[in-house]
Amino acid sequence: LARAAGRPVVVLAAMLQHSPLMLITLERPDIQTPGDLANKRPMLEPGSNELLPYLHRYTRSRQGETLPYERGVQALPRGQADVISAYSTTEPFTLQQQGIPYRVFSPRDIGYDFYGDNLFTSENEVFNQQERVQRFLQASLKGWRYAMDHPEEMINLILEHYPSGAGREALAFEARETRALMQPDIIEPGYMQQDRWQQIARTYQEAGMIKAVPNLTPFLYNSTQASLRQQRQLLDRSVAI
């Protein structure tokens, strides 16, 4: 969306092959299918724009027609919303622990398959700070690989040094679900395809969120192209001198 708006952002890597974002509602007789979400009260958290094409397809709701996000998944049993944005890695476990029956609706069910936990930077950073970008990217990938290979160690680390209120069982659930979305056993962490980004852009276009699919070649990080561009810039400066 930012690239389509003309902002010079660059995506470095897609850490999750599938986004954890989905819609969740309480199990109730009047909400059985996505079409039943029409005329219901959706509550979306900031940064969940990827759910709008799915929601718009069935309800014609747009971003300005959703409720302000507050209280998280507890908004459902309190009757503050009929359906909310949620992460498959966390909210289902919370409702399970509370013994509350729920139903989920995922954009993936109709082919809206977004990447998750993407790393972004700016064109300026890519072309002027190549070494820093590379170090950051490689460190991030290394960290993710280690976390996937040592989930118990990461859980202990979080509980001891970065307590978030989530207990061991909740963190273990999150680790399992994250691994399923990342698929590190069959896909290299960070891997992404231009064709898939193209399809994501078309999904936004069909929902009326962007006017046209932008040129995505400069949007996807390519260390070789960045190096060549920097070399050309240095050569141009040398010629000018």
Language-model regions, residue ranges each:
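Class I S-adenosyl-L-methionine
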Residues: 3, 52-56, 96, 159, ...
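Generic structural signal for helix capping and beta-alpha/helix-loop junctions
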Residues: 19-21, 52, 93, 112, ...
